[in-house]
UniProtKB/Swiss-Prot annotation:
Segments forming domain DMA: 261-296
Family statement drawn from the similarity comment of this UniProt entry: Belongs to the DMRT family.
Function recorded in the entry: May be involved in sexual development.
Gene that encodes it: dmrta2
Subcellular location: Nucleus
Organism: Danio rerio (Zebrafish)
Protein name, UniProt field: Doublesex- and mab-3-related transcription factor A2
Tissue expression remark: Restrictively expressed in brain and developing germ cells, especially in spermatogonia, spermatocytes, spermatids, and sperm cells, and in developing oocytes, including early perinucleolus stage oocyte, late yolk vesicle stage oocyte, and oil drop stage oocyte.
Amino acid sequence: MDLRPEIPPASQAGSQVHPGAAAAAAAAASIPVSMAGSLLRAPPLLLRATEKYPRTPKCARCRNHGVVSALKGHKRYCRWKDCMCAKCTLIAERQRVMAAQVALRRQQAQEENEARELQLLYGTAEGLALAAANGIIPPRQNYEVFGPVSNESNSGESNIQKFELFPKTPLPGTVTPHQAAGKSVSTDTESVPGMSSPDMRHGSGSENGDRESIVSSPIAKPLKDGEETPGSISPIGSDSGSDTDKDEQEPSPSSAASRQMNAIDILTRVFPNHKRSVLELVLQGCGKNVVQAIEQILNNSGQAKGPEETWTAERMLQSVQPTMSSTPRPMLPGTMTLSNRSAFSPLQPNAPHFGSDPSTYPLSTHLGLNPLRLAYSAHSRGLAFMAPYSTTGLMPTLGFRPPMDYAFSDLIRDRTLLHKDQSYTNGLYGPLVNNTQEKQ
């Protein structure tokens, strides 16, 4: 049922339509006008804010107890400033946490601003370290832990401290031909007061905060220069150490040579009394295996330290006598002699088969046995061909000793004295002839 044609003429609506229907139509016609008026009218909340004063902070303690009071100038005179109720305690904890967060954010923002300014001035962490060492940048309170040590120590003490913390021979990647050519320049710069101590340069650090302090730390700095930028020239690499250390530094052509240098450095530290050339020969003979080289040197150190290890008169006499070894291996002259100290040797220094028969061991050169594994005899257990732990029981043709020599080696001293006066030949069947003479 459509009522639209009846609504516009008011005279017809009053005569033809029921008065109730006319009132409903008038109300429906007035709805859009009221909605438009409500949209044009400002919200009451904004009117209230513009009419009255703006919102001011209120005291939370007073609000917890039902009182509204402005916070400005109220903290000292608050009635509940010492209240210990649950709500007031929670407010105090929140205030403490917020204060700590604000202080931390301020400190971080200050550090970031300083780091940004210093990056614009110097550009890199190396420039920051150099500027801090020269006194251009005053060290912050965070880095004052290293201050007293670096200020009180001279160049000699700082070098000693550096040798305790870092390897004596720096990484070969940090040395460049330009640095080798500029040794005189670096020695002159070491006499400057600002550059006298390399630890001061490390200790003051950069001003970059927590993020860049890791990059400019004294341990991460040489590693970064040695691995990532081997050809870079840094003030830390050019001034650190003394002239004797710089003479020992040699540029390495490849990573394999650097690993070999590290292995030789380890051997020189473990055995400071041995020559470097001898250690290099041992390392090359062992296939550049540091563990085998250390075992080799320990096995042969007994011959070099024979006069010091005076366990018996037999040991002293043996150290004086020349070794009767046959053709030695090329790794070290004296390698084929019997080892007096081994990690697997039994605790029987007076055993006749252990110290008094030097010609029994060189037989292993003809058989191609390992010179490092001589410790126990295998023929006492009936294992004649057990190569890693064999002495005179290598083959049945080489002869056997009576078991009583090995079982009672510490008790039978007269037989040990007989062995030291006998001289054996280097022939393959020399021990066989001598053993037949010993049996009597």
